[in-house]
């Protein structure tokens, strides 16, 4: 529905019609349009970043980041306006369920980035310290990812170079 008619087409009545059920049936699951939209946003995030069967891209930080940026570009093409519209709409306080769902999805992405950083055998032994942890670097990578989403810039080149210089190369 979103891909064909856009975000504005999503409401309780249109979802009920598309599913061939009564409006009341939809209200059994969602109390409001905001709650419905929160579930839709969460579903789209999961579809965009669904973990592939080939796990090899999660063994290496650079390969993982390249995959994430490819998926961001895919998401932008499949769901035009998703990244900007949902970010603006769900940061409003009255949409706390949508905000909670978005934060849960973002936390999942952050956790996966941390796992990849901890598994990556190519990372120098001294790359992380007590002050500069894998979690800290995952936060930086995630911030760069969000910035790229808002700018619709899906070229990971600069981020991959930052990773290479920060984690893999020995400083002189």
Model features per residue range: what roles?
Residues 30, 86-94, 147:
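Short helix-capping/turn signature of helix-turn-helix
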Residues 77-81, 85, 94-123, 132-135, ...:
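Amphipathic alpha-helical packing segments from all-alpha helical-bundle domains
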Residues 39, 53-78, 134-138, 160:
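Hydrophobic alpha-helical connector segments
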Residues 85-86, 141-145, 163:
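Short alpha-helical scaffolding segments that buttress acidic/His motifs in well-ordered protein cores
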Residues 62-88, 150-154, 172:
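Helical hydrophobic small-molecule/effector-binding pocket
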Residues 42-49:
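Short, basic, alpha-helical segments at the C-terminal edge of helix-turn-helix-like DNA-binding modules
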Residues 1-35, 39:
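Helix-turn-helix
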Residues 11, 49, 81-86, 125-129:
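Short, hydrophobic secondary-structure boundary micro-motifs
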């Amino acid at each position: 529905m979103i891909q064909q008619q856009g975000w504005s087409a999503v409401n309780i009545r249109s979802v009920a019609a598309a599913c061939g059920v009564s409006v009341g049936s939809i209200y059994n699951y969602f109390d409001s349009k905001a709650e419905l939209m929160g579930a839709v946003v969460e579903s789209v995030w999961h579809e965009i970043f669904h973990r592939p069967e080939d796990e090899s891209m999660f063994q290496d930080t650079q390969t993982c980041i390249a995959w994430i940026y490819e998926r961001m570009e895919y998401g932008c093409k499949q769901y035009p306006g998703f990244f900007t519209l949902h970010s603006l709409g769900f940061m409003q306080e009255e949409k706390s369920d949508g905000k909670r769902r978005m934060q849960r999805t973002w936390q999942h992405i952050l956790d996966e980035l941390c796992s990849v950083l901890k598994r990556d055998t190519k990372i120098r032994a001294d790359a992380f310290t007590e002050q500069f942890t894998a979690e800290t670097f995952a936060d930086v990578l995630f911030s760069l990812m969000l910035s790229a989403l808002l700018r619709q810039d899906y070229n990971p080149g600069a981020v991959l170079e930052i990773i290479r210089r920060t984690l893999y190369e020995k400083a002189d």
